[in-house]
Amino acid sequence: DPPWDVLQYGSRGAVQHYGLLTPSQIRDLPLADLCAENAHCWLWVTNGTLRIGYDILESWGFTPRSIFTWVKPRVGLGTYLRNTTEHCLLGTRGKAPVRFKSQPSWGFFPVQPPHSHKPEEFYDIVERVSPGPYLELFARRPRHGWAAWGDEIASDVVIPGFPVPKYSDALIKDFHKKAEGA
């Protein structure tokens, strides 16, 4: 789940919880070097980053194949509409097989995890559909059988030039906006 620095200026948005990355910074992640030649990539996007997500997935060398929609039990934030969904794009590279082809393209999980955390059931879906090995970028907690990378967890991999910056463009703009009003 990339920390998108897109439309994050509200008092309850992602900028209040963690450092953010611009779409260019996310695109610059060396995902091609971290994945096998035959691989699946599941990329979480918000409603506001859906189009950008497709571009980034393709820039990493993956062909978009499907979209999984998480229907949330509570009404969330939104710039235009109050979002109750989040999406995960599924892309493939090479000839990675699909292990389970009857997976519905949506899920409703009755317990909504804390801000930006994804439901545990989603990891089960990934393991059912995609062959391993598994790597979660921007991970928050370890999962058995998965490698992890993120600034909130002991990472299994190193990505030169990263971790997530502590001060994103949105946070800096918000700081200046508040300073001008003071």
Per-segment meaning from a language model:
Residues 2-182:
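Class I S-adenosyl-L-methionine-dependent methyltransferase catalytic core
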